Amino acid sequence: MAKFETIAAEDRARAGKGVARATRRAGKVPAVIYGAKQEPTLIALDPRIVLREMKRGGWRSRLYEIETASGKARALMRDIQLHPVTDQPEHVDFQRLAAGEPVRVAVNVNFLNELISVGMKRGGVLNVVRHAVEVLCDPDHIPDHFEADLGPLDINDNIRWSDLKGTGEAKPTITDRDFVIATIAPPTVVAEAAPAEGAAAAPAKGAAKGAAKGGKK
């Protein structure tokens, strides 16, 4: 299961644009934790934490335990608003997690045994359709990742949702089909270019001279 990462934050007493601007002037990023049928919790974050998570990637599916002086909250980072000119974080939205209340989250797919894949050894090309799968699951059972075994796949074979390992209690948001995760495509064959029509029709240099001499009477 995925692990919660702890981040420190400060409590904010009030909401509003003026208060948010004051928070930014103080060198902090205003944020809110909402959901789980509770009142929103107003907090302020160190901008370096937000920038670090943005650079790491995958922050929308990472699990956080937010610690403030008033307590702790488990949450997903759902949105980061950036300044239109500086690209510095201006506001962060977190979704509060509650045990027993399913959440929608994207889980990354790890592809295994690519080097020993039957199809890859024959020159096939791995075509990844989904690097991550959006699922619904309990916050306490969110998988860290799914695994796709490429070892037995030949050319034109594919991996579907039902082939993934580590899905556990996660349910995909796509429910109408056993959707494709990746496929081993045939190798690309580059055909030799045909000679241009004019070049094909042009006679050899020697033949052209012979024809010219033979034409004189």
Curated annotation (Swiss-Prot):
Q: Where is the composition biased (Low complexity)?
A: 195-211
Q: Tell me which InterPro entries the record gives.
A: Rbsml_bL25/Gln-tRNA_synth_N (IPR020056), Ribosomal_bL25/Gln-tRNA_synth (IPR011035), Ribosomal_bL25_b-dom (IPR020057), Ribosomal_bL25_C (IPR037121), Ribosomal_bL25_long (IPR001021), Ribosomal_L25_dom (IPR029751), Ribosomal_uL5_bac-type (IPR020930)
The UniProt entry's coiled-coil ranges are none
Q: Name one Pfam family in it.
A: Ribosomal_L25p
One GO location term (cellular component): cytosolic large ribosomal subunit
CDD domains attached here? Ribosomal_L25_TL5_CTC
Keywords assigned: Ribonucleoprotein, Ribosomal protein, RNA-binding, rRNA-binding
Span list, region Disordered: 195-217
> Could you tell me which cysteines form disulfide bridges?
none
Please give one Gene Ontology molecular function term for this protein.
5S rRNA binding
GO terms of biological process kind: translation
Q: Which family does it belong to?
A: Belongs to the bacterial ribosomal protein bL25 family. CTC subfamily.
State how it assembles: Part of the 50S ribosomal subunit; part of the 5S rRNA/L5/L18/L25 subcomplex. Contacts the 5S rRNA. Binds to the 5S rRNA independently of L5 and L18.
Reported function: This is one of the proteins that binds to the 5S RNA in the ribosome where it forms part of the central protuberance.
Name of this chain's protein? Large ribosomal subunit protein bL25
UniProt organism field: Acidiphilium cryptum (strain JF-5)
